[in-house]
């Protein structure tokens, strides 16, 4: 099965949250045969193939896991000038789409729901500044030459089940996405 995610300005090569939604609909609607307790299949997005593993029971997809497109860092420790904030160090990366990656702690964010409006506003400024001041390069998709989103990352924490961190992704127009 294939899908295309359409945006007002561009059509992203891949979307993690939309891949999860598409996989759920394909299974729950019976478009793809469900095998309980686990169904494996492949989705095709404009950027490439996405492996899907779905945990299923009672005719419903309960949990979806995806293997994203190959990811890479584009640049580390780049300096951006942001109006009202001054100079800021950022990384840039590709993980199904192009991101400006920012240390939320260094900007005073805890990544809590009450900060969503401020994160969305600043994220738009950061993404715009990156598109004006930095270059994005994808080795396969040469026409993908812009930054789509700002990914605010919290500190990496260790736990019994591995490492994790809080994050928030600012998307247009001034919103926070549910997944990076």
What are these regions (language model features)?
Residues 1-14, 19-180:
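Active-site proximal loop and beta-alpha junction motif in alpha/beta enzyme cores
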């Amino acid at each position: 099965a294939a899908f295309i995610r359409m945006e007002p300005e561009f059509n992203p090569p891949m979307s993690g949250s939309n891949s999860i939604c598409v996989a759920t609909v394909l299974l729950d609607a019976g478009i793809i045969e469900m095998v309980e307790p686990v169904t494996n299949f492949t989705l095709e997005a404009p950027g490439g193939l996405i492996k899907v593993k779905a945990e299923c029971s009672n005719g419903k997809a309960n949990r979806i896991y995806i293997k994203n497109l190959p990811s890479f860092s584009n640049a580390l420790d780049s300096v951006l000038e942001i109006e009202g904030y001054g100079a800021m160090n950022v990384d840039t990366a590709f993980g199904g789409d192009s991101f400006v990656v920012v240390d939320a702690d260094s900007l005073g964010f805890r990544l809590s729901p009450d900060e969503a409006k401020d994160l969305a506003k600043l994220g738009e400024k950061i993404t715009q500044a990156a598109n004006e001041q930095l270059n994005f390069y994808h080795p396969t998709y040469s026409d993908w030459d812009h930054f789509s989103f700002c990914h605010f990352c919290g500190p990496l924490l260790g736990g019994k089940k591995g490492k994790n961190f809080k994050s928030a992704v600012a998307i247009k127009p001034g919103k926070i996405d549910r997944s990076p």
